[in-house]
Amino acid sequence: MHLEVIVQSYKKSKYYFSHTFYLYKFIVVNSPDMLHISQLGLFLGLFAIVMHSANLIKYTSDPLEAFKTVNRHNWSDEQREHFYDLRNLYTSFCQTNLSLDCFTQILTNVFSWDIRDSQCKSAVNLSPLQNLPRTETKIVLSSTAANKSIIASSFSLFYLLFATLSTYTADPPCVELLPFKILGAQLFDIKLTEESLRMAMSKFSNSNLTRSLTSFTSEIFFNYTSFVYFLLYNTTSCVPSNDQYFKQSPKPINVTTSFGRTIVNFDSILTTTPSSTSASLTSPHIPSTNIPTPEPPPVTKNSTKLHTDTIKVTPNTPTITTQTTESIKKIVKRSDFPRPMYTPTDIPTLTIRLNATIKTEQNTENPKSPPKPTNFENTTIRIPKTFESATVTTNATQKIESTTFTTIGIKEINGNTYSSPKNSIYLKSKSQQSTTKFTDAEHTTPILKFTTWQNTARTYMSHNTEVQNMTDRFQRTTLKSSNELPTIQTLSVTPKQKLPSNVTAKTEVHITNNALPSSNSSYSITEVTKEVKHTRMSASTHEEINHTEIAQITPILNAHTSEKSTTPQRSFTAETFLTTSSKPAILTWSNLLSTTPKEPLTNTSLRWTDHITTQLTTSNRTQSAKLTKANISSQTTNIYPQTITGRSTEV
């Protein structure tokens, strides 16, 4: 018998932790005969020597055979006994709201990640991977067949623990219950010292888990994993992590490991898996789900019998101490292919001020700015003295503060249908280099931000919703068509800080999308007419008891389109109320198209309309704004995969 322990460790100075911890993942490989001893290797080596001396470790070619189906009821009585023993040890140190079914899947999914060509489809934040101290330990065990070894890698198992919590095959109730943030917080504070190692080894040697180290392949792998998880959580202090580890990270990248590829969202502090019934994710708490009560666990030696399926605990809620930033939330849905998420930096912000005139201007210095549409530019609207605005011109490369209120949607439509990066609609605002702010007398920073995102993460649409019919006009629309459906639209209404007690905001969204996604549609004829609509809006001021009448002349764009075929439609109307809470309110809707084009779109047109109405109410006045968008593309031949460009105007 030969033993080789190689310990390699280093720390990145920029991301130095106050303590070093070690995580383990075991793999059988070939290795020469050598012997190097360290504190960590000594304990692992002694453990391996004892197991090998007792002829408890054997190598087989198919270690995954017994765990290809996640069903603990198919296990033997001994396996089931060890499972409950492990779970009791797990919960005795760090109680988490984790059901038996979820815990079973976590353990059994560990084995599936070494299958060839497997791909991680994780929705868990993996950004700490880039900041970890790396440690690799190698233990060589000789057998009659060949020299085999076990590799323990801190990097590998840290990734493994995150990846197994959100596997593609996990049941939705399990995915919704997994305590992502709690587990991530624990992993930052693992104190694997010599004393804790000795305690863990002692508890493990006295546990019923050791009796499962038999010659059966399934039990070998089951208990290797059991020991790893037991060692991990037995030495965890259960102290929440500090969010500073997330702040100085690079942009989203693809991470390739021995378990496959995944997207690492470094900017996502509160990455959350959306519920199957709601896309509104404003609460940091773990959703509650009713799970059937499992069978009673058997009585095991040196363990406590569990009487309930779940153990309730208050989740750790990360806090952000910046003055102008609320929690960043990104709704991420697993996809069939890895892709980065794009965040624009040219979204204007809103503020409210006193005593001036609202005016929207175009940045004429932008050489890429499209020509001005007639009768729609340089519109100035007079409003009462209690409001004013300021337009600030910024450089194209300057990051506007409103980008911290980004809500991104990536969502599968049905089954295995996902949006493709080729299927994109790009909407560029005419004031993409300008910022219009509105603040009230009590604040110096914007208090409201309205942003609409359309289609995939590579596609976005920003509405600068203002009071008194101040509309953000999109001058140029680029339509790209493919054989896949668009996915999602999200409206985010986010306060920068708590609104005054006398201020409430109500936003109503109505979406109607029309399309001709079939090559059978031979033509589309569109007639556009303009009319002038006179409206009168009233608003009270601080200085007057009576209402001040304000005459408005609003151009209306009427579009009448006739097609040869039937146009599928999807409509959605929703309201959201924003009061004194500082949390964002999110509306999400999908099903923009009802069918999938089977071939390139030929002689067809894509058109869609939507409007957003926002009403801001204070104790003494109410201001409303309605944003209407109408886009009509001309008749086009064979637009796939080419690009068509149309003009659009909001009124």
Swiss-Prot record:
Glycosylated residues, chain numbering: 74, 97, 147, 208, 223, 234, 254, 302, 355, 378, 395, 469, 502, 520, 546, 603, 620, 631
Provide the alphabetized UniProt keywords.
Answer: Glycoprotein, Host cell membrane, Host membrane, Membrane, Signal, Virion
Ranges in a coiled coil: none
Q: What is this protein called?
A: 120 kDa Glycoprotein O
The segment annotated Disordered runs over: 275-303
**What's one GO-annotated cellular component?**
virion component
One Pfam family, short name: Herpes_U47
Q: Origin organism of this chain?
A: Human herpesvirus 6A (strain GS) (HHV-6 variant A)
Give me the stretches of Low complexity compositional bias: 275-292
> Which protein family is named in the record?
Belongs to the herpesviridae U47 family.
List the gene name: U47
Matching entries from InterPro entries are given as: Roseolovirus_U47
- Where does the secretion signal sit in this chain? 1-56
